[in-house]
Amino acid sequence: MWWREHRGRILALARLGLVLGAAGLLAGCFEPLYGSNPSVGGGSVRDKLAEVLIPPIPVRQGTPQARIAVELRNALQYDFNGAAGAVAPTHRLDIVVSPTDITVIIDPVSGRPIEEIGALTASYKLVEIATNKTVLTDSTFAHVGYDIPGAQQRFAKERARLNAQDRAVQVAAEAIRNRLASYFVAGT
C-alpha cells in the first residue's frame, strides 16, 4: 500500500498543519503591551504610566544612596513621562533603595580588591491617590560587576563604581517600568 511507504511524510505534514493551525489561533490572542487597550480605561499603558507620581526617594542627603535615589527617580520619570507636560496623577510610586558593593576577587599579591559587584535593591509600592490604597507592592534588584584598576589610577575606581551604579539604576528602572506596565494591563 502506498500510504505505508509515505507514512513518515504524511505524519510530518499533519504535525506541521497542527502547529500552523495552533499558531494562527494563538496569534489572535497577542496584544502589544504599549498599544491602545480599552481594558485600561480607554488609554494606552504609556498614558497610565504618565499618570504615576514619583515623589523624591527618602534618603539622607550627601550619602552615596542620595545619588542613586536621584538617578533612579530621574530614570523613572523620563521612562514614564518623557518630555511631555504634567499630567494629573492617579497613582503614587513610593520607592526605598539600598545599594551595596560586594568584593568578589582580591589580588593575592597586594591584598586589594580587583573586582566588585554593585548591588542595588529597590522596594516599591504603587498607591492609588484617590483612596490612598496600596495596589501593588514589589521589589527588584540589579547586580552589576566592575573592575578596579591598580593603584596608579587614583580616580578610576570611583568612576568604575559610579558607572556600575548608573547601569544598575537603568536595570532597576526598566524592571519597575515593566512591572507597572504589566499591572496596568493585567491588573495584577
What residue spans do the PLM features occupy?
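Conserved acidic
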Residues: P64, I68, I114, A160, ...
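Surface-exposed short loop/turn segments
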Residues: A83-S139, H143-N163
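Sec/Tat-exported extracytoplasmic proteins
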Residues: D79-A84, E128-A130, A175-F184
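A structural "domain/chain start" motif
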Residues: W2-L20, G24-N74, V185-T188
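N-terminal, post-signal-peptide region of Sec/Tat-exported proteins
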Residues: I68-T90
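C-terminal/domain-edge helix-coil "capping" segments
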Residues: Q152-T188
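Short, well-ordered turn and helix-capping elements at secondary-structure junctions
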Residues: E5, P58, F80, P99-D101
